[in-house]
Amino acid sequence: MLKTIRKHGITLALFAAGSTGLTAVINQMTKSTIHEQALQQQHALFDQVLPPDRYNNNLQESCYLVDAPALGKGTHRVFIARKDDKPVAAIIEATAPDGYSGAIQLIVGADFNGTVLGTRVTEHHETPGLGDKIERRLSDWITHFSGKTISGENDTHWAVKKDGGDFDQFTGATITPRAVVNAVKRAGLYAESLPAQLPHLTACGE
């Protein structure tokens, strides 16, 4: 009787150990898969704001942290694009703090000469049917930044038409596009300062 109990106890212990090990392996595999999918989604998003033929380095391995008021409160990431090891452009995370329903998060692709190469909204809480037209899936409005050059902080073209600029506002929603235009402009201007900062920037993960 005692031998039988011990035998069953050992069997259960081995089963439990095996189950725990299998669960750990599955969890690790799941984490790896989720991480890989996140990287692929990020890469696809990068392609929308920075033409792949402009650089030949791994952007995701060229990530730096910056604390710049021009990009909004807190720390933001910048990804430096290089062509044959020469810095040529950047993808910059930026925050428009003055959206109608709160902060709007964006990424902006820009070269170092004041030209915006593309931008996309990554997070917002704007009103459905009005301010949410900043999303690419709902409107092509966000694509109108591509190829636009900023001549300086006082460039009047970088405003919505209601304020005398070149960018359309939305019917019934001016605050949202105004916030995005201003945030993209600030990010584009900030990009011009990046080459000089590169030796001093903190790499992501450090």
Swiss-Prot record:
InterPro entries xref list: FMN-bd, Ion_transpt_RnfG/RsxG
TM spans (from-to): 9-29
Known cofactor(s): FMN
Ion transport recorded as keyword: no
Enzyme class: translocase
Modified residues (FMN phosphoryl threonine): T174
One example of a Gene Ontology biological process annotation: electron transport chain
GO CC entries: oxidoreductase complex; plasma membrane
GO molecular function terms attached to this record: electron transfer activity; FMN binding; oxidoreductase activity, acting on NAD(P)H
E.C. number: 7.-.-.-
Membrane topology note: Single-pass membrane protein
Record's keyword terms, sorted: Cell inner membrane, Cell membrane, Electron transport, Flavoprotein, FMN, Membrane, Phosphoprotein, Translocase, Transmembrane, Transmembrane helix, Transport
Protein origin, superkingdom: Bacteria
Record localization: Cell inner membrane
Keyword Repeat attributed: no
Assembly and binders: The complex is composed of six subunits: RsxA, RsxB, RsxC, RsxD, RsxE and RsxG.
Family note: Belongs to the RnfG family.
Purpose: Part of a membrane-bound complex that couples electron transfer with translocation of ions across the membrane. Required to maintain the reduced state of SoxR.
Protein name: Ion-translocating oxidoreductase complex subunit G
Organism field: Salmonella typhimurium (strain LT2 / SGSC1412 / ATCC 700720)
